Amino acid sequence: MAFISVFDVLGPNMIGPSSSHTAGAEIIAYLAQKMITPPLKRADFTLYGSFAKTYHGHGTDRALLGGIMGFSADDTRIRDSFAIATERGLAYSFTPNETETDIHPNTVDIRMENAEGRVMVVRGESLGGGKVRIVRINGVQVDFTGEYNALIVVQRDKPGVVAHISKILSDRGVNIAFMRLFREGKGHTAYTIVESDQRLPEGVAQLLLENPNINDVMIVQP
């Protein structure tokens, strides 16, 4: 018999009327902001499918803005996301895209720019019941849910990099639940995503960056 989570039946604790359009949207944005050094100065949201049609009426816009500011799905400040973003000096925009149809119906692209001028673009899908999937980072197709502690390594696709990552984690006693490599092409930019059911110890990022073929390390913990 298939296991059914309580979230599949009732959905998560959340602010807003829909687990797909509010809680899921908030979680996508919350995960996205973990991938860039704060503070953010701008966030631009492109919405697809049903997100594009109902984003204002269902509170998807407030949920996305709250998530990008680091609010959890049950944080009552989400109701005042617009005012809080203005107070913080965070510029934002929402652009519905109803022409691209070959895409999951609850999809959003989030373009973030921080105070240092660094830009990152993340695509996420809201699957229902507060479950989400991150499917693209800076144009590279990836796949992770944010349900585990995630280590995201941005690297050049060179021999020995994955072995370096595995050794560092093994030496620090990290139990790997999932480990996958995503790349643009041979020798180009690649992402290794490691998911673990334990929190990642301090200092892991610095040790990984000792490899000259590793450009960046992001830790996304729920």
Regions found by a protein language model. Give the residues of each.
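A conserved regulatory-domain signal marking ACT and ACT-like small-molecule sensing domains
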Residues: 92-96, 122-222
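An N-terminal amphipathic alpha-helical segment
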Residues: 30-41, 46, 130-131
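Acidic-glycine-rich active-site phosphate/pyrophosphate-binding loop
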Residues: 1-6, 37-41
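A structural-propensity feature for long, helix-poor, extended segments
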Residues: 44, 48-87
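Conserved phosphate/anionic-ligand binding catalytic regions in large, soluble enzymes, centered on
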Residues: 11-29
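Generic secondary-structure signature for well-ordered alpha-helical cores
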Residues: 11, 15, 33-38, 69-73, ...
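Contiguous domain-boundary segments centered on the initiation and propagation of an alpha-helix
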Residues: 69-120
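Catalytic-loop motifs flanking and including active-site residues across diverse enzymes
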Residues: 24-28, 60, 161
